[in-house]
């Protein structure tokens, strides 16, 4: 979309995209070139992924003593909320190097993000990329302002408000590229959320598999502050590793039967691409719980984990739910080791009722 040459493709043929940070670095380099009298239509920068990548200039405007350049972000075949957004850099000569955030770039208000509180939410790798890019052009001190028009509105669709990044988006990226279907930005924000919780003194967090699960978890665990609740999606393994790294002592995993069933099957990435629910496992748990022959026959034809939940409820088989969460907890605890302590709770779909939790059901209200 914004590049003069086709972006690279992965082994499956999907287009690789480029991070907000890579676009910001390319925009800053183009603006620095324009400060020296050039009018670049294309600039290339070095990506941490290991190659030089050209970027096409979308906007170049001389304003006062500086130059504004805009690039259109192309996230490839894994579009995120910033796909198609304009990433701008305004660059001018200064007495010393300064990197600032402009319109649509958030400000860090809580510790734990790797960026000092009060600074623009431009992560360490993009910061380095920006300065390396402009240093290819000039050694003179520069003031660089990164902006994302419309970023404040786009940020409402991200985890930034929960992370304490206010007023706009984060400038992210560790490699400069967005791998198709990696959901790398979301994964990174989930890991950051764990770090923010710990940096603000929390030793116990609740990791939920979705927005609905999070609402249920907040009712089940009223002793936890809002910051402790982290919507992890499919990334339970990432949450546990992040918790271990920063010293979180307790992780309470709260979810519905589809995701919890995958955890019970030993999966630490529960996206559909990571495999289907093991219905044979659920059938064996139903048998262990004492299901009637009629229920077992119906379960043998079931196509979803939800149907197993319905059958267990109809039969009054609380043991099915207990054994399921116990198995999930044991698999997750074995995966991460002794610390953090892992607790798993299963809710229904509609009322947020806790059907079972292991090993400390008494902690969960309802």
Swiss-Prot record:
The gene is cbiD. This is Cobalt-precorrin-5B C(1)-methyltransferase. The keyword Nucleotide-binding does not apply. Keywords: Cobalamin biosynthesis, Methyltransferase, Plasmid, S-adenosyl-L-methionine, Transferase. It comes from the Bacteria. Belongs to the CbiD family. Signal peptide: none annotated. One of its GO terms (molecular function) is cobalt-precorrin-5B C1-methyltransferase activity. GO terms for biological process: anaerobic cobalamin biosynthetic process; methylation. The keyword Lyase does not apply. Its EC number is 2.1.1.195. Pfam families: CbiD. Pathway: Cofactor biosynthesis; adenosylcobalamin biosynthesis; cob(II)yrinate a,c-diamide from sirohydrochlorin (anaerobic route): step 6/10. It catalyses: Co-precorrin-5B + S-adenosyl-L-methionine = Co-precorrin-6A + S-adenosyl-L-homocysteine.
């Amino acid at each position: 979309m914004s590049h003069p040459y086709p972006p690279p493709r992965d082994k499956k043929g999907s287009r690789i995209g480029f991070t907000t940070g890579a676009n910001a670095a390319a925009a800053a380099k183009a603006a620095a070139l324009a400060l020296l009298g050039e009018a670049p239509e294309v600039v290339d920068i070095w990506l941490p992924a290991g190659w030089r990548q050209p970027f096409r200039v979308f906007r170049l405007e001389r304003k006062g003593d500086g130059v504004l350049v805009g690039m259109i972000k192309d996230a490839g075949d894994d579009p995120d909320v910033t796909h198609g957004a304009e990433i701008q850099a305004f660059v001018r000569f200064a007495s010393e190097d300064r990197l600032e955030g402009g319109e649509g770039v958030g400000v860090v208000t809580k510790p734990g993000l790797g960026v000092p509180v009060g600074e623009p939410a431009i992560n360490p790798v993009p910061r380095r990329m920006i300065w390396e890019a402009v240093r290819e052009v000039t050694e003179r001190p520069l003031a660089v302002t990164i902006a994302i028009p419309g970023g404040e509105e786009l940020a409402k669709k991200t985890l930034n408000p929960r992370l304490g990044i206010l007023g706009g988006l984060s400038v992210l990226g560790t490699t400069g590229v967005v791998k198709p279907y990696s959901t790398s930005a979301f994964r990174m924000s989930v890991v950051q959320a764990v770090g923010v919780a710990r940096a603000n003194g929390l030793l116990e967090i609740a990791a939920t598999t979705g927005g609905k699960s999070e609402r249920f978890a907040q009712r089940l665990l009223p002793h936890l502050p809002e910051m402790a609740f982290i919507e992890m999606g499919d990334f339970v393994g990432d949450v546990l590793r992040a918790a271990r790294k920063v010293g979180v002592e307790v992780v309470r995993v709260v979810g519905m039967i589809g995701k919890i069933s995958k955890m019970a099957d030993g999966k630490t990435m529960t996206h559909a691409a990571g495999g289907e629910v093991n219905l044979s496992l659920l059938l064996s748990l139903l048998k262990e719980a004492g299901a009637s022959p009629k229920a077992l026959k119906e379960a043998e034809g079931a196509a979803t984990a939800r149907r197993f939940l319905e059958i267990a409820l109809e039969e009054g088989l609380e043991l099915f739910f207990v054994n399921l969460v116990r198995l999930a907890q044991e698999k997750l605890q074995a995966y991460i080791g002794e610390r953090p302590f892992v607790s798993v709770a299963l809710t229904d779909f509609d009322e947020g009722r806790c059907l079972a939790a292991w090993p400390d059901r008494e902690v969960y209200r309802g």
